[in-house]
Amino acid sequence: MNQNQDKGQGLLGRKVGMMRIFTDDGDSIPVTVLDVSNNRVTQIKTSEVDGYSAVQVAFGSRRASRVNKASAGHFAKAGVEAGTVLKEFRVAATAASELKVGDVIAASLFEVGQKVDVQGVTIGKGYAGVIKRYNFGSGRATHGNSRSHNVPGSIGMAQDPGRVFPGKRMTGHLGDVTRTTQNLEIARIDADRQLLLVKGAVPGAKNGQVIVSPAVKVKAKKGA
């Protein structure tokens, strides 16, 4: 495993969708396909200039006419195509020194079998009730219940305390929040098409943007 992985260097990507692959033993493994092509370095930050070491990466493609002047100048200075998203990855100074502006970081940054964390924006569900949002139980269908089948029930008490406590689970917007799924294993890497096949599901809809980084809570193998 190279030094960039140890210090948190990751990749930006796009969720292509889900499929399944088969092992040599014939076992079926559900995987999510992530497109991590064309991760280009736009800036190298150093402790001397910026106070910390980091690598800034751009992903995606955007027309120059759709980028504001500040971003256009930033991309032009780096000599790279304008991207849809920028992300910094904190790395060691020695790892940052191995890269230069304009470099493309490939999927080979990771290895098959490595554990990664994948961050994305979950699918928005709109305004939802407590049954869908928090898995509450429904009220009785009959026996005197005529209009309270899906209500949450009591949300407070009487004059004391005379208020609804913060954090009370009620109806509201569901989804469309940033979430991270941890310790997903890379099942396969397609170097030609710059694809990562990750075991299991990752947050977000198809074509959603994701951030793939080395797992921060890797569990030690038993007997290791």
From Swiss-Prot:
One GO BP annotation of this record: translation
The keyword Ribosomal protein belongs to this UniProt entry's keyword annotation: yes
Keywords (A to Z) from UniProt: Methylation, Ribonucleoprotein, Ribosomal protein, RNA-binding, rRNA-binding
Record PTM: Methylated by PrmB.
Biological role stated in the UniProt entry: One of the primary rRNA binding proteins, it binds directly near the 3'-end of the 23S rRNA, where it nucleates assembly of the 50S subunit.
NCBIfam families, sorted: L3_bact
Subunit relationships: Part of the 50S ribosomal subunit. Forms a cluster with proteins L14 and L19.
Family: Belongs to the universal ribosomal protein uL3 family.
Protein name listed in UniProt: Large ribosomal subunit protein uL3
Source species: Janthinobacterium sp. (strain Marseille)
Lineage: Bacteria, Pseudomonadati, Pseudomonadota, Betaproteobacteria, Burkholderiales
